[in-house]
Amino acid sequence: PFPDLPCARTAAELNALAGEPLICTGTDAPGGKLTVPPVSLTELARIYDYVLVEADGSAGRPMKAHAAHEPVIPPAARRRLLVVGASGFGLPIEKAAHRPERYAALAGAALTDPVTPQTQAAVMLAENLHDSVYLNQAETPTAWAAAEELARHLECPVAAGSLHQGVFRRLR
């Protein structure tokens, strides 16, 4: 799935890549996606210093309210990093959020209300699924201001940046 990143789809491939500092692993799933890796996350944690697991998606939207069964957090997880897209700020909740009705209810807002740092913080605090936050897509002064405002509403480590632009800054 990542052209410049080695990807192990089997245990044998994973063993062959054991010396690589950064890899992708998973089992092929329909639609060109990857699902659970060929070995347990506990085994991966034994081999690598850090294992980053994408717990669930957001149907391409920058904000999300999680269903009761989400995210599936592996028992071996030591940290829970929530990634939020800055491109959702200012958009109506119904356009920016996956599961917009639940998002609006958690935020105490209407579906047509814009997503603000305050509404995003309200959703995150209500769900309590994170212990640190990364705000991606911080590519404009407006996005950086929203990131800084979001950080003021949270009590955990918060970083922001743009993976596209290669910019990163810790805010809290």
List each model region and its residues:
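Conserved catalytic-core segment of NTP-binding enzymes
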Residues: 3, 31-37, 41-47, 56-157, ...
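Short His-Asn-centered micro-motif
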Residues: 25, 53-56
